[in-house]
Amino acid sequence: MSSGGLLLLLGLLTLPAELTPISGQDRPIKPGLCPPRPQKPPCVKECKNDRSCPREQKCCRYGCIYECRDPIFVK
C-alpha cells in the first residue's frame, strides 16, 4: 500500500474520534436530547458533563450555561 493510501486509511479510522457531541464531552453519553434553552442568568455552570448529573439527566449546554436537565426523546 502506498504511503498516501495508508494516510487516507489512518485518517478515515480516526474520523469518528473527532466527532464528539457537545453535550457531555466525557463518556458515557446518556440517551435523549436536551430540551429547549431555559430562561436563566448568563453563564451558570451547574455541571461539567453527563456524569456530573443525577439519574438519567444530561449536562446540557446553552451558550455559556451548563445545567442538568431531563432528556427529551424524538421519534
UniProtKB/Swiss-Prot annotation:
GO molecular function, one term: serine-type endopeptidase inhibitor activity
Disulfides per UniProt: C34-C60, C43-C64, C47-C59, C53-C68
One Gene Ontology cellular component: extracellular region
Tissue: Expressed by the venom gland.
Cell compartment(s), UniProt: Secreted
InterPro entries documented for this protein: Elafin-like_sf, WAP_dom, WAP_four-disulfide_core
Signal peptide segment: 1-24
Coiled coil: none
GO BP term, pick one: venom-mediated disruption of cell wall in another organism
Pfam family, one: WAP
Positions of the WAP domain: 27-72
Keywords annotated in UniProt: Antibiotic, Antimicrobial, Disulfide bond, Secreted, Signal
SUPFAM superfamilies on file: Elafin-like
Protein purpose: Damages membranes of susceptible bacteria. Has no hemolytic activity. Not toxic to mice. Does not inhibit the proteinases elastase and cathepsin G.
Name of the protein this chain belongs to: Nigwaprin-b
UniProt organism field: Cryptophis nigrescens
